[in-house]
Amino acid sequence: MTRGLLGAAALLALAGGAAAQVDTTARDTTARHDTTAHRDTTPAYLPAFAAARPEGPLPRGTRYAFPADSFAFSNAQTLADLLAHIPGVYVARGGMYGQAEVVLYGGRGPAGVEVYWDGVPYLPLGRDSVYLDLGRISLAPLERVDVLVLPATLRIYLVTARQQSTATASQVRIATGQARTANYRGSYERRWRSGLGLSLVADYNNNDGVSGSSSTPFNSVDLWLKAEYLPTPKVGVSYQIASSSWKRSPSDQPGLTDHFAYKRRDGIFRLFAGAREDGLGPRLDVAFVTTSASADTAVTGRSLSQGALALGNRWGHGHVGVTLRSQDEDRPWQLEGSAAWIPLRPLTLAADARRARYSNSRNGERLHLAAGLALPLGLTARGDVAWAHDLQAPALASDTAQRTTDISGALRWDRHRITVEVGLARRDSFVPLGHPAGLRPLGGLGPTQATRYLTVHAAFEPLPGVHFSGWYFDPSVSSGNDFEPQYHARVSATFYSKFWRVYKSGIFALRGEIAMDSWSRGTAGLDTTGNVLALPGATFMEVNVEVQIAGVTIFWIQRNMNGMRGGYVPGLDYPRRYQFYGVRWLFTN
């Protein structure tokens, strides 16, 4: 009782003291609020459009992936340079940078290459509505290139930059070299926390060519702009504009290089809606594309539009999808389907099919099946079957469907520092149509024989930072097919190190590479009068050195360093010891 009274008295005393200390001063309502508080500038990583590339799972070794470092920190200057790393690819170059670069694969002419820009077919348009000049597709807006290799076809998926961080990123590149080569490139990428994004890339190239050769003066301007809005990972919308304009001057000697002025503009609208934030489950994709080609005095301007509606479903061990496309009058509609599945852990199955309707009541079908099996000791076996009864150039009214069945298989061995793959394939005969407009002496390709061929691909790292890689291609026919000489190989040796013991922060990197592309004698199609062109054997070497310090990269590249007299196409020579060098700056925030 006494303790309770004492406690109550103590509380009353404290309360009285506190009341005596109450501040009775009137509040100053004119005082300004503290504005020194900083807003949250910590970068946030936001959702982005899923990369439009082949849906997996796929058998190991069927896909080649080239991330941004593959063409930003390497000797690749064009898309064709990247594809030269794939066994069996022949790049028919009209000369130095700026001249035509036509990728030939599988003896199928224009049907050997399919290109998709963010999942949308990139169709040839303009003076050449059959072949794509891959040297004129700028790498500047791209963050990734995936290539799905079929027995006689390359499906190339180009993925544009997808900025996810709210930290603003920008890049500047300046390069110069022989023939008054000049390259200026700039990019700016920004994402806001609301989900809004803006990306801009500008790329300017110019050179004065080499007098008296097929390497004539060239100038190009590539612009790319993309705006996107992804309020949640489940839904998003984007619109991008890709504009490319270039001019190639005629050669001093008639019949080598024609005057070629060209401007292409693509507008791509995309929308997606998914059921889950992790990208699994049902998903809807919609795309609408407009493309125009102009500025060429040799042909009238032309435009086309495309629409696509895709429905798919992904889960942990597979996917299934169907796409309906409506394209130009030459391709009224296409229905595509794809599926992949891992029924058992060592087994992977994949398939895709297409049914197409073309102008003049023509139809086309194709089917591709693939399987892969993981074996002990790091071995993997895979096989592909591609059947088609399809057109190769729907823009040509004379094109008719050709029936082909192509089969390939490979055995791959992967260890920690070594990869070896040996493949065999059989392709049906084929008659390519048309001729590349940028390769003036080439009047077309001759018929391709039914061919069996051997490919070998290997990569080896004997020491940390030291890499050897290469491939070998051998068609088992006595004379070879056009641009498929009996022996063709590419090898390279690369040194790459960040010198961690000296630069512990990782601020420094050094890369050096020497590569060689060599082939034996063969045939190179037909000239403009129908006579067979002989392809001389040749060896071209190149060297690349790059030094990276933080966000600055200094590079030097020399092509045809061994001074080879000749070229990749008969009659079109390649400059000897052509070199260019420059610097790239990468800024963040």
Regions found by a protein language model. Name each.
Residues 120-149:
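Short acidic/polar hinge/loop motifs at secondary-structure boundaries
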